[in-house]
Design a protein with these regions (language model features):
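Bacterial N-terminal signal peptides
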Residues: 8-18
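Hydrophobic small-molecule pocket/channel-lining residues, especially in calycin-type beta-barrels
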Residues: 25-177
Length: 177
């Protein structure tokens, strides 16, 4: 009986190892959404720069952190201030989406568009919370431009009454470690 049990255990272990080995040879399929999400993960760390005007705009700090076992990238804008905002980037049903927790008290959601490239992620409004209609003021679109590994520009389009009324721009550089 012990021999049969040991043989069965060894056979089960061998079968499991064979399955793992077979899968290990497969390359995970990559999608534009997954590639873009991986690019966001590379932003991890502290970034400093300007909001508004590249030279004279107000100082801005942004912290990027990968969280939730690698399934979410958290962007904290103006950390520790009364105007602190958080944007969470994550994959949902194979699409890269974001939820922006705005100082205005609403939470617009956006999805990566087909216009996105490896150097520029383009997001557009798909809904949100505390926004009763598209006429309510909210962030409606966002673009992140990667300039090498240590520079980033982002633009956030604000919509009011169904049309774009402002674009918030950020010019950031990675804090040296």
């Amino acid at each position: 009986m012990k021999t049969i049990f040991r043989f069965g255990s060894v056979l089960l272990l061998a079968l499991c190892l064979a399955c793992v080995s077979a899968r290990g040879g497969e390359k995970a399929s990559s999608t534009p959404a997954q590639d873009a999400f991986n690019k966001l993960k590379e932003l991890a760390g502290e970034w400093h720069g300007r909001a508004g005007d590249r030279e004279k705009g107000m100082e801005a700090t942004v912290i990027y952190k990968t969280t939730a076992a690698g399934n979410t990238v958290m962007e904290t804008l103006f950390p520790g201030t009364t105007h602190e905002m958080v944007t969470m980037y994550y994959l949902e049903d194979g699409k890269l989406v974001l939820t922006h927790y705005c100082a205005a008290g609403n939470q617009p959601r956006m999805a990566l568009t087909k216009k996105a490239t490896p150097e520029m992620l383009d997001f557009n409004f798909i809904g949100g919370a505390n926004i009763s209609s598209r006429r309510d003021g909210h962030m409606h679109a966002a673009r992140l431009r990667f300039i090498g590994k240590d520079a980033l520009e982002s633009e956030w389009d604000y919509f009011q009454d169904g049309k774009k009324t402002d674009t918030k721009k950020f010019y950031l550089k990675r804090k040296a470690s």
